[in-house]
Design a protein with these regions (language model features):
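Long, low-complexity, charged/polar intrinsically disordered regions in eukaryotic proteins
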Residues: 1-22
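Basic amphipathic alpha-helical segments that dock to polyanions
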Residues: 71-75
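Short, cationic-aromatic polyanion-contact patches
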Residues: 85-102
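Short amphipathic alpha-helical segments
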Residues: 28, 45-49, 66
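Positively charged, polyanion-binding regions of nucleic-acid-associated proteins
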Residues: 16-42
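Short acidic, hydrophobic short linear motifs in intrinsically disordered regions
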Residues: 39-53
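Short, positively charged loop/turn segments that connect secondary-structure elements
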Residues: 53-68, 80-90
Length: 102
């Protein structure tokens, strides 16, 4: 019996510039709304990962996800306020940055 490669295969989606800009605009809007709804006003990368999962960005597309997240939080909209613990299963307990609206 042949030994099969059991690694998970992903259908990697590539984004055009317009798709990327649209997704970024929607993610920043989502994060802004979420920050306004919370009494602490804090949003994290976990919140961005939740949005990207709902948008269909595969969990295996690490570079794509990080690119979206870094772009969203590096803009003028958010200020880094400290660190908190991640609640995502993939990063359980790791320290991640917390952001508030600028």
């Amino acid at each position: 019996m042949a030994n099969r490669n059991r690694s998970t295969r992903y259908n990697l989606k590539s984004y055009s510039n317009s798709e990327r800009q649209t997704t970024m605009r929607r993610m920043v809007s989502y994060l802004r709304t979420l920050a306004n709804r919370r009494s602490s006003g804090v949003v994290t990368a976990d919140d961005a990962h939740t949005f990207l999962t709902r948008e269909g960005v595969n969990i295996g597309q690490v570079r794509t996800r990080l690119s979206f997240i870094n772009s969203a939080f590096s803009g003028e909209m958010f200020e880094r306020t400290g660190t908190t613990r991640s609640t995502r299963p993939q990063a359980k307990g790791r320290a991640i940055s917390a952001y508030t609206l600028a």
